[in-house]
Each structure stands twice: as C-alpha cells, then as structure tokens.
Amino acid sequence: MARTTPISRYRNIGIVAHVDAGKTTTTERVLFYTGKSHKMGEVHDGAATTDWMVQEQERGITITSAAITAFWKGSEKQYPHEHRFNVIDTPGHVDFTIEVERSLRVLDGAVVVFCGTSGVEPQSETVWRQANKYGVPRLVYVNKMDRAGANFLRVIGQIKQRLGHTPVPIQLAIGSEDNFQGQIDLINMQAVYWNDSDKGMVPVRKEIPADMLELAEEWRNNMVEAAAEASEELMNKYLEGEELSIAEIKAALRQRTIAGEIVLAVCGSSFKNKGVPLVLDAVIDFLPAPTDIPAIKGSNPDNEEEEMERHASDDEPFAALAFKIATDPFVGTLTFVRVYSGVLNSGDGVINSVKGKKERVGRMVQMHANAREEIKEVRAGDIAALIGMKDVTTGETLCNADKPIILVRMDFPEPVISVAVEPKTKDDQEKMGIALGKLAQEDPSFRVKTDEETGQTIISGMGELHLDILVDRMRREFNVEANIGKPQVSYRERITKNCEIEGKFVRQSGGRGQFGHCWIRFAPADEGQEGLQFLNEVVGGVVPKEYIPAIQKGIEEQMKNGVVAGYPLIGLKATVFDGSYHDVDSNEMAFKVAASMATKQLAQKGGGELLEPIMAVEVVTPEDYMGDVMGDLNRRRGMIQGMEDTVSGKVIRAEVPLGEMFGYATDVRSMSQGRASYSMEFKKYDTAPSHIVESVTKKQG
C-alpha cells in the first residue's frame, strides 16, 4: 500500500505534566477536537476503522493505550492537508519517572502543561530535566487560566528562573480567573475568543482590546526579536527596522524551537474549552516532523563499537523500538513500537536484535479516540501495537533480520528498594509467578528474583509507591493475593584502593586437570562508569586470547555477589596483565574460576566499602510546619540542599538515605496535619556510615 500521509505531516508528541496541571482534560479535549474534525472510518494509512466491539463495551475493557492516533487540519481548516498526530501518553507521578522517560525517548516533541496558578512545581522540574536529557523540543501550555490566582506572565517568569530555559510567549491571556475570555495571538496581532455553543471548536477573531494594545506590542517585539536571532540575515533585516513577514517569523520560531534554543508559550483553559485548538495549531507550526530531527543512532549487533544510523524514510531497512508492553485479557500481549525507518507488513518476520531472537508479527493495531483499528502495515514515523510478540521487553529493537541494528538503548535505573512477597494460598503461588513475569516484562525498572537461601520471592523497584501499585495491579488484574514483607534497601559495594591480585586455580589429580592463572590490577573505575571497565594488557601470549573473555566473566560473576556484604560491586576497573597457562589442563572454566578467586580477595586488599542509595527528596509544606519537617529530615541523616517559596508553600530540598525514608509518607502527613506532600527520586550511591555497615554485615551473617 502506498503512504497516504507524507512523513513531513507526522507529529509524534506527548502531553507531559506533573499531577495537577490538567493533563487528562487537555488530552481528552485534543481527542474531542481531532475526532470531531476528522470523520472516523474515512481513508487512513491502512484500513477503515471498526468501532469497539459490543462485548468490549459490556465487559468494560480499557486497554491502557500508550499512543493514540488523531488527525488535524487546523482550527480554521487553514492547512490544505491533514496532519497525523500520534499522541503518546505519559504519567505524571514522580515514582514513574521511568514511564515518562520511555515516552520521551520515542517522542519528537512535547507539549508541557503547567497550571496557571501553581506554575512550576518541583515535579515539573523532574520532567523538564528528562526532556532536556533526550533533547526533546517543546511548547509550553499554561492551563487553568480560569482558576483563582492564575497569572500567565508569572508562570513565564518561573520557567525562565527555575528551569533555566528561554520562554517566548506567542500569546497573552485576555483577562484571568472568572474573567478569562481568550488569548491575544501575537503573531497575527488579533484577539481570539471562544463560543460555548460549539464547545470552543472554532476561534472567533476580533480586534485586540484597546487597554491591552500596548502590552501586546511590547510582547510581540520580544517575540520578533527572538525570531530574528535565528539567522544573521533576519537579524540584519530586524536591526534595519524592516518588518519581518508572518511566514518569516513562524519559520524562524520553528527553527529555534526544534534546535532547543527557545520554548514557545501559549495559554488557555482546557476545562472551559478555551484554547486547545490553538495548541494543536502550534504543534503543527512549531514542533518537528520525524524528518526534522537527526537520524536515530544505533550500533551493529555483531560489533557494538560500529555506529550505525537510520533516517526517517520508508526506503531504509525496517527498525523500530519497543517502548511499552501492555497486557490485554483478550489479545494477550501488546507491544507498542515506534517505527524509525522502513516498512513492516503484518505476517512479516523480524529480529529482536538485542536478544538475537526471531519474531513473527501477527496482527497490528492502532488506537484512535473511540476505536481500535487493525492495520496491515506500518511505516517510518508510525506508532502502533504489535500482537503476537513472544519475547520482547521495553527498550528492545525490532528490525529487518538481514540489516540488523540495535537502536540506542534506554538507560533503566537500578531498583533501590526490595520487599519479599508471599502468595496467601497455594492457588496464588502459580498465578503469582505468571503475574510477576508479565509485570516485569512491562516495566524494566521492576525486578523479580528468588532468594537462594530463604526461597522467598523478592521484588525490587524505584520506591514504596512503585511497589505498592504493582502489588495492587497483581491483585486487580491477575487476582493474586499476596503478603508483603518489610522493605529492604538495595546497597552496593565499591573498592577504594588500587591493588594487584593473583588468581590461581590448579587441580591436577588424575585424568585431565584444571589450570588457570592470571594477575589482575584492580582500581576504582573512571568517573561516570557504573559497571566493569575491563582492559587486557597481556603481552607475548602468556595468557592465550581465547581465555581473556572467561577472565572477564569470572570477575563479572563475582561482582554480582560482592566482596564486603554480598551486595553488587559497582564502578570497578580491572586490567589483566600477566598469568600463565598449561597446554593440556587450561580451559575457559579454569580461568573463570581463577579470576573469580582474585576478585574475592578485594575485600581485604581493595579497601572494599558499602554504599547506600541517597534520594533527592522535595517536601512542599505550609510555613507553619517547616521547622518540624526540617528537624525530622535532619534526624533522618538528611542534608538540606535548599529552600524556596512557592504559591503552594515552602519547598524544602534535601538528600536523604533511602533507609531512613521508609514510612515517610505517613510521618510527613501527621507532622503537617495532612497538608504537606513530598516526592523523591534516586540521586546517587554514597559511602554508608559505620553503624549501617555493622548492622548490614551482621544481617548477612
């Protein structure tokens, strides 16, 4: 089938916000306006849609849709052709930063929603940081302009001051709170109002109110100046006092937004139906198509050193990234993918290049606001759900088997908290295994393992809330009742000294013996290296090349078991530089054991130390309770990093060891009569004090 929407008219966007900015309402309005203006069941890039089946409505199934496809021709039908939006859903809670990260990884642009009253809140900063990390161009939408205390320009000031970005308003608010009526469109210098009769579908353009003209001219000048900075040519034109045309202003603002130099800002009230169609227009005008951003990078599965890339084109080999796995009771596992290049037809074979496993694509579906559409093919720039994938985890690449590539992996943080789970009945035992397996496949920051000594099932995640929700999902979705143990901290270990250690494993008693012998130089790894940095400096073949990987494996396996108290060893540099071998008795196993024996000696010779996870904690509290909250954080070995005033109270930032934060949610509520709230995320590992080391080593026996 031929492509019906050219890739230049695609917009893969996310609507991103923290908990209370009004993201859900905004997303609903986006679907309402796009669904209204585009008759479902007309021609798509695929087949006609089938409405939800009756049993689905009766059974009340809702598939957690990771992405919804919608179409838009403009609030005043000003674009000659429809643009295709893929709106990717992102959660707002900070315990799910991993969810936000994986959405941002496959987005080309984002609309960041702020509340007109509370403005930039601590959690907005987390989301903003993540968008910076993935270089996502964004627009700012200041919502809830009808709320008491709403002030568009104050929020613009906060974005500049707290987020360190240059916001450029392309609108101003007309009125605020109960009197919020609409926007001033600074590009066209018109006032825009909305009718209740069509639920704010079509903007009504009028002249700018006389009392706002001066302010509008001032902000338009700021905007034009920001546009002129896009090129020397425009700057000269601007400085010489020539008018920039509307087309020039738009093109320049688009260029600077995509380059990440500025963020354009608009305002409105999603709930009162005032402004969302203009947000959609701004997405088309200023956010990138897949072809506007650099080609995606990857590596050759056979040689990880070799860099490769894929351009957003149907003519390149097929490559897609699985960014979310969801379980549906009727069709099984849905694997949501973002296609970066090439074409895939249902029934095609692909390879999961990370695992080296072949997969066959059964059916493919796309989600719309009110229908699920089965499609026969996906092309570069598309987002769809594949049915029938056997063994694909979030973050893995699916690609053409003849031209494999591993797309840049997402970094998933290591879990910082663990609890033991036990099924309540024998019946639950088997179901729990299946449920945990499915949940771990969906969420790479959630791990499941069996403790070899106690036989208990241990689950690990990013915070208490993260694990609570997963246990709750196990009960709701899989009918598994389980008891939860006390939370345990996931410590780490590292060495502090450089040392040279000999590892020798010799068994020569009758028949074929074992002989492995190596000298390894150990040191703390270079800055920023978390795992093992392994170097081979053996010369003259004293240890044959084929045994070097076995030495690396021996070190890695021992690192998992630690050298101080049985916790994983991180940040280790190991250089094998000497050794010897036996013509007959040497083999890979012997060298692996020798390297493992050498690594074990690090406890004595490498100055091994225990590290504890430190969390970045932000507490928002009314001023009356600030003293209590700070005193309590100090008692928990917290280091106060800073404080500031916000509309919602005092924000206290601190770094606190995770081990001291268990049960904090309840404590902070009772300290503040339920008025304080907090968020926390993993920051770093740091040396644990001696009393913690003692109690941990005692526990490990």
Curated annotation (Swiss-Prot):
Locate the residues binding GTP. 17-24, 89-93, 143-146
Does the keyword Transmembrane helix feature in the UniProt annotation? Answer: no
User: Which GO cellular component does the record give, naming just one?
Assistant: cytoplasm
- Name of the molecule in the record: Elongation factor G
* One MF term in the entry's GO annotations: guanosine tetraphosphate binding
Principal location: cytoplasm
Which species is this UniProt entry from?
Pseudomonas fluorescens (strain Pf0-1)
Key words of the record? Cytoplasm, Elongation factor, GTP-binding, Nucleotide-binding, Protein biosynthesis
Q: Where do the tr-type G domain residues begin and end?
A: 8-291
